[in-house]
């Protein structure tokens, strides 16, 4: 929106307030001013001249010698090449010494042997953009009307001392797409009064209903239509003041009738359209929806193909305008027009927006209709335009307005709670201060206790909720005046909780052991959830109400399927070995239909495949196996101080290898499992031998760990004894180790499993397990007899509790 500062001063007293101050105030009030255009552009010394004589240059076919009166004692001779220069014209003359935009200085000069003492100017040479210049002056000099005084300042006559504010409006402030809204905004910001001209059209000659009837077929898309008749008009150029205001606002003057409709559009924000009444083709106006494929030629001489949801203005048969977008060429106001039908209507914003978008046709009218115009100003704008047309085109307004439909004027009441507003804005405004702001804005209100019931004017369609009023109060009070406050709160010593510290230990240990952390989706498919839930197999899959896809339709109950997806993805991309883990949540419920939030439980899972060590000169490469996984977990439990509480027991889990899977228990309570994926499942997923583990982190970390105890380096030698035991194949090494540690006494410091044998030379159903036992006393050197006694006691207990016998 381009706002002329001089035009704005007609409505608001801005004496002593510069355009720059207005721009600053508007910007700080939420109406951003992008730039201030200075129309003068540094021009000086241009006056109104009168061409007394014009004859052809003796030495040039396309030049003229002009004698021009410029308000001085003697006329001056000027050489002019404009094709439209003629005697009797009043023109803009840049005198010798004048400066034109671009710092172009005018000097005396000889052109083809003839002296030229100045320059007769076109509007473009005075800084007017070519697109705003009237067609008749586009290729030549500008000609003033006869009422302009000779010798007066031509720049002032052309309003070139004006400044234009370019507003960058947000979509909610369409009320400022017109001078009416801007005037009230500026008046509110500066606490001024608005002096708005009264708009009354007093038609006296006959009744408009004798000329035309109006009918609306779709009242939802066209709630109101009004037609005013102005007869005996004489179409011609607009007066200079009207042309100047249109040019300043970025609109090219066309003719007095059309210029008035554009002027009122800028003034009120209400789009109007002027039809040549005699070219309508009937005395009837009917608004209706287009027929699919119906065609019409618009004012830009383009044939448009219409759709069935486009709203048209018709003469009862043929379309004469696309409602709210553009008029038709057949009913255009032309030089011989004598009777004008002036349209003032309210069209549905969505209907106008769709037609404009479908046709690729955007106009000043459509841009306002699609944002919603003020229904309260429709009739007022029509009356203002009718009066101006009669004034500038010499017409007579026919009595009455022919109307159809009704204007629904909505002014919603919005409540504002003062303490709530102060709390939200961080201010302490009183009732009187808030009331004064609403008075400046022109908002009606009532007050009861701390509550304001506020009614905004119909032009302010953006005021709908309490927060809108908060914004208005803050804008008018001044954002810069809102006190700056900093958050207040006591400082506390930062630190991680015990749970967080343990989680960090897990991450640090696993990464040190060579595993990489991954993060996978919390959503999966129901099919993938089957068969690998581990200890969560009794829980039902939880489907999402509106999934993005079937691949992400179910909340996970296990981390393992997701890790296997990661393994599969990387193996397919030539990664031969992969060691990964994830700390994440699973979602558990035993209800088919959820009546409460599912249980969210944090789990730790890992997946390992490929070679654990590479083939180097120090030794052969080693593939991942169950004991690698078990060793990693034992190291992690040692880091957490849980070594003495954790046991691995042979077990079975869905989707896991039956002979290479162990249940992990802490103090006899199951917290997870570790083992190899079942070969059939590996084959389905096209995986190599892959091992996984999954632990319930919350159950694990709630256990109290043993504190690390530091001991001095031993001064006395230790004694080691190896034992190889033959046991039933269902007896685990962990069971044997527990018996050994329970009966080894204080001298037994370490128990290390170093051999497991099954196969040839072993009785069926039996296996051999060998341990190395280390005995040590920090106070003295142990004797063989002392160690042998303890060792034999261990063997007796092993035989009694597990049936183990010493291997011969």
UniProtKB/Swiss-Prot annotation:
Q: Which Pfam families match?
A: B3_4, B5, FDX-ACB, tRNA_bind, tRNA_synthFbeta
tRNA-binding domain sequence ranges? 40-155
GO BP field: phenylalanyl-tRNA aminoacylation
For the B5 domain, which residue ranges apply?
Answer: 409-484
| EC assignment | 6.1.1.20
What reaction gets catalysed by this protein?
Answer: tRNA(Phe) + L-phenylalanine + ATP = L-phenylalanyl-tRNA(Phe) + AMP + diphosphate + H(+)
Please indicate which superkingdom the organism of origin belongs to.
Bacteria
Per UniProt, which keywords does this protein have?
Aminoacyl-tRNA synthetase, ATP-binding, Cytoplasm, Ligase, Magnesium, Metal-binding, Nucleotide-binding, Protein biosynthesis, RNA-binding, tRNA-binding
List the SUPFAM superfamilies.
Anticodon-binding domain of PheRS, Class II aaRS and biotin synthetases, Nucleic acid-binding proteins, PheT/TilS domain, Putative DNA-binding domain
Q: Which GO terms describe its cellular component?
A: phenylalanine-tRNA ligase complex
- Residues binding Mg(2+), per UniProt: 462, 468, 471-472
InterPro entries noted in UniProt: aa-tRNA-synth_II/BPL/LPL (IPR045864), B3/B4_tRNA-bd (IPR005146), DNA-bd_dom_put_sf (IPR009061), Fdx_antiC-bd (IPR005121), Fdx_antiC-bd_sf (IPR036690), NA-bd_OB-fold (IPR012340), Phe-tRNA-ligase_IIc_bsu (IPR045060), Phe-tRNA-ligase_IIc_bsu_bact (IPR004532)
Task: Indicate the enzyme's highest-level EC class.
Answer: ligase
Q: Which cofactor does it need?
A: Mg(2+)
Q: Which residues cross the membrane?
A: none
**Where does it localize?**
Cytoplasm
Q: Which GO molecular function annotations are given, in alphabetical order?
A: ATP binding; catalytic activity, acting on a protein; magnesium ion binding; phenylalanine-tRNA ligase activity; transferase activity; tRNA binding
Q: How is the cofactor bound?
A: Binds 2 magnesium ions per tetramer.
**Residue limits of the FDX-ACB domain?**
714-807
Tell me the subunit arrangement. Tetramer of two alpha and two beta subunits.
The family classification in the record reads: Belongs to the phenylalanyl-tRNA synthetase beta subunit family. Type 1 subfamily.
What is the protein name for this chain? Phenylalanine--tRNA ligase beta subunit
């Amino acid at each position: 929106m381009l706002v002329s500062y001089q035009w704005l001063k007609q409505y608001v007293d801005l004496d002593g307030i510069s355009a720059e101050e207005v721009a600053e105030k508007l910007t700080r009030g939420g109406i951003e001013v992008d730039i201030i255009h200075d129309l003068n552009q540094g021009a000086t010394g241009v006056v109104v001249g009168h061409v007394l004589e014009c004859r052809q240059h003796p030495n040039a076919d396309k030049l003229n010698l002009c004698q021009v009166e410029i308000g001085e004692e003697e006329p001056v001779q000027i050489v002019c090449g404009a094709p439209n220069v003629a005697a009797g014209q009043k023109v803009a003359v840049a005198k010798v010494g004048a400066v034109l935009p671009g710092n172009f200085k005018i000097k005396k000069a000889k052109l083809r042997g003839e002296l030229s003492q100045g320059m007769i100017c076109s509007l473009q040479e005075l800084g007017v953009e070519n697109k705003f210049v009237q067609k008749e002056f586009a290729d030549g000099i500008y000609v003033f009307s006869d009422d302009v005084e000779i010798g007066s300042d031509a720049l002032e006559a052309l309003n070139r001392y004006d400044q234009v504010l370019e507003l960058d409006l947000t979509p909610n402030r369409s009320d400022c797409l017109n001078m009416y809204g801007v005037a009230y905004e500026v008046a509110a910001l500066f606490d001024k009064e608005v002096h708005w001209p009264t708009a009354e059209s007093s038609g006296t000659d006959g009744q408009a209903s004798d000329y035309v009837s109006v009918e609306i077929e779709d009242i939802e898309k066209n709630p109101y239509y009004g037609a005013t008749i102005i007869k005996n008009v004489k179409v011609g150029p607009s007066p200079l003041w009207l042309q100047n205001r249109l040019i300043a606002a970025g609109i090219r003057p066309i003719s007095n009738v059309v210029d008035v409709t554009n002027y009122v559009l800028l003034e009120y924000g209400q789009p109007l359209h002027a039809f040549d009444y005699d070219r309508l083709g009937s005395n009837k106006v009917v608004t209706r929806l287009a027929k699919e494929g119906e065609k019409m030629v618009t004012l830009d001489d383009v044939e448009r193909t219409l759709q069935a949801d486009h709203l048209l203005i018709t003469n009862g048969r043929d379309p004469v305008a696309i409602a709210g977008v553009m008029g038709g060429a057949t009913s255009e106001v032309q030089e011989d027009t004598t009777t004008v039908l002036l349209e003032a209507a309210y069209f549905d914003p969505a209907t106008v927006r769709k037609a404009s978008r479908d046709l690729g046709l955007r106009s000043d009218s459509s841009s306002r209709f699609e944002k919603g115009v003020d229904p309260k100003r429709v009739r007022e704008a029509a009356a203002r335009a009718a009066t101006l047309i009669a004034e500038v085109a010499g017409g007579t307004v026919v009595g009455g307005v022919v109307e159809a439909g009704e204007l629904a004027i909505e002014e919603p009441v919005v409540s504002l709670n003062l303490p709530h507003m102060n709390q939200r804005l961080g201010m302490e405004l009183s009732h009187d201060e808030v009331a004064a702001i609403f008075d400046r804005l022109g908002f009606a209100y009532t007050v009861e206790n701390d509550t304001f019931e506020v009614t905004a004017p119909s032009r302010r369609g953006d005021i709908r909720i309490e927060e809108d009023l908060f914004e208005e109060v803050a804008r008018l009070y001044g954002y810069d005046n809102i006190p700056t406050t900093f958050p207040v709160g006591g400082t506390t010593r930062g630190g991680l909780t015990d749970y967080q510290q343990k989680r960090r230990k897990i991450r640090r240990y696993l990464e040190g052991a060579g595993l990489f952390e991954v993060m996978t989706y919390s959503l999966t498919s129901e099919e993938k959830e089957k068969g690998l839930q581990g200890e969560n197999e009794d829980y039902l899959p939880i489907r999402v109400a509106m999934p993005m896809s079937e691949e992400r339709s179910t909340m996970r109950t296990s981390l393992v399927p997701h890790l296997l997806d990661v393994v599969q993805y990387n193996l397919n991309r030539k990664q031969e070995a992969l060691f990964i883990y994830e700390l994440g949540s699973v979602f558990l419920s035993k209800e088919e239909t959820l009546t409460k939030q599912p249980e969210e439980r944090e789990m730790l899972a890992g997946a390992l495949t490929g070679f654990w060590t590479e083939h180097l000169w120090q030794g052969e490469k080693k593939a991942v196996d169950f004991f690698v996984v078990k060793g990693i977990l034992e190291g992690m439990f040692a880091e957490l101080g849980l070594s003495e509480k954790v046991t691995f027991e042979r077990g079975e889990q869905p989707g896991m290898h039956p002979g290479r899977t162990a249940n992990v228990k802490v103090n006899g309570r199951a917290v997870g499992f570790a083992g190899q994926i079942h070969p059939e499942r590996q084959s389905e997923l096209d995986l190599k031998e892959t091992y996984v583990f999954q632990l319930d982190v919350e159950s694990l970390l709630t256990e109290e760990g043993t504190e690390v105890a530091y001991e001095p380096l031993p001064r006395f030698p230790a004694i080691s004894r190896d034992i190889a035991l033959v046991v039933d194949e269902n007896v685990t090494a962990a069971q044997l180790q527990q018996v050994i540690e329970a009966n080894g006494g204080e001298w037994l410091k370490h128990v290390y499993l170093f051999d497991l044998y099954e196969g040839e030379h072993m009785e069926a159903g039996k296996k051999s397990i060998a341990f190395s036992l280390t005995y040590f006393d920090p106070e003295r050197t142990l004797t063989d007899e002392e160690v042998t006694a303890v060792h034999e006691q261990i063997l007796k207990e092993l035989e009694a509790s597990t049936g183990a016998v010493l291997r011969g």
